[in-house]
From Swiss-Prot:
Keywords, ordered alphabetically: Cytoplasm, Methyltransferase, rRNA processing, S-adenosyl-L-methionine, Transferase
HAMAP family: 16SrRNA_methyltr_H
Compartments it resides in: Cytoplasm
InterPro entries: RsmH, SAM-dep_MeTrfase_MraW_recog, SAM-dependent_MTases_sf
UniProt protein name: Ribosomal RNA small subunit methyltransferase H
A GO term for molecular function: rRNA (cytosine-N4-)-methyltransferase activity
Length: 315
């Protein structure tokens, strides 16, 4: 792979506008993936520290010419983005000018059947971003029905989680993404041509559980709070309500304001604001959705870091 990204990331123009990268800026792309955001940030003249726990993404990024400049303008970190404070400290970087996060599975991972993230093509039931630790098959073939049901309900918002869990138990062992998709479709009923495959929620839930994605997001947001300089910008793209809820609540809690007891009462200042200029939810245009259907469910929220000290949990 060259320096040109193989996949166009969602809300690219909006993310770049939110970060407003300038030559000489030091930025973090917390979710490198195929490198779409990183490419745009590098083109602005910035230096980018890019994180990804997927070794395939890191291997592809290592071929980019910016990694070979002296000093390099692209520094790759094969680790979780929740570790960005410690990783950048090791690289001699105490603060950065901007952080971009694109949460969840990457297009590159979805398009590789052997990674086991999607049911559009049959592949091993894996779903691990890092390719280390227990796989989706390990979890589904060993967990009790109650645990599986809880995961499906909490992370997939699957209302019929217990029915699906019982069907999974009855069909074990499951080895491929096709095995899991067929079990879920049979349990819930699948009409050809339905707008949404009933297996979607189960795949999302299992993937989030296997990779600890929501805890990673929470820790990553606090890491960004600690790392951003005063005036630095945070931009987070999420793809479902669970993620967006976490981002929204984080920014609300960092705004320094508490909501009134009534919608008719104003918010009141309760602590120093950690972030200001907090945006409302930004959605992709119809034109972008037409170009890239995966953008349909995406939401961007962005904010600017103040000079208030980070909260203890951000350290």
């Amino acid at each position: 792979m060259s320096g040109a990204a193989a996949h166009v990331p969602v809300l690219l123009d909006e993310v770049v506008a939110a970060l407003d990268p300038q030559p000489g800026d030091v930025l973090v792309d917390a979710t490198f993936g195929a490198g779409g955001y990183t490419r745009a940030l590098l083109d602005s003249g910035a230096t980018v520290h890019a994180f990804d726990r997927d070794p395939d993404a890191i291997a592809a990024g290592s071929q980019w010419p910016e990694t070979k400049e002296e000093p390099p303008r692209l520094v790759l970190h094969p680790r979780r983005f929740s570790e960005m404070v410690h990783a950048l400290a090791e690289a001699g970087v105490a603060q950065v000018d901007g952080v971009a996060m694109d949460i969840g599975v990457s297009s590159m991972q979805l398009d590789q059947a052997q990674r086991g993230f999607a049911f559009s093509a049959d592949g091993p039931l894996d779903m691990r971003m890092s390719q280390h630790g227990p796989s989706a098959a390990d979890f589904l073939n060993s967990a009790e029905a109650e645990e599986i049901a809880d995961v499906l309900y909490q992370y997939g918002e699957e209302r019929q989680s217990r029915r699906v869990a019982r069907a999974i138990i009855a069909a074990r062992p499951l080895e491929t993404t096709g095995d899991l998709a067929r079990v879920v479709r049979k349990a819930l009923g699948y009409r050809v041509g339905a707008p949404k495959d009933p297996a979607t929620r189960t795949f999302q839930a299992v993937r989030i559980h296997v990779n600890g994605e929501l805890d990673e997001l929470r820790e990553g947001l606090h890491a960004a709070e600690h790392l951003l300089r005063s005036g630095g910008r945070l931009a987070v793209v999420s793809f479902h309500s669970l993620e967006d809820r976490i981002v929204k609540r984080f920014l609300q809690s960092a705004s320094g304001k508490a909501g009134g007891t009534s919608r008719y009462l104003p918010q009141t200042d309760v602590s120093p604001a950690i972030f200001s200029d907090i945006s409302k939810a930004i959605r992709p245009s119809e034109a972008e959705i037409a170009r890239n259907p995966r953008a349909r469910s995406s939401t961007l929220r962005h904010a600017t870091r103040t000079d208030a000290p980070p909260r203890k949990e951000a350290a």
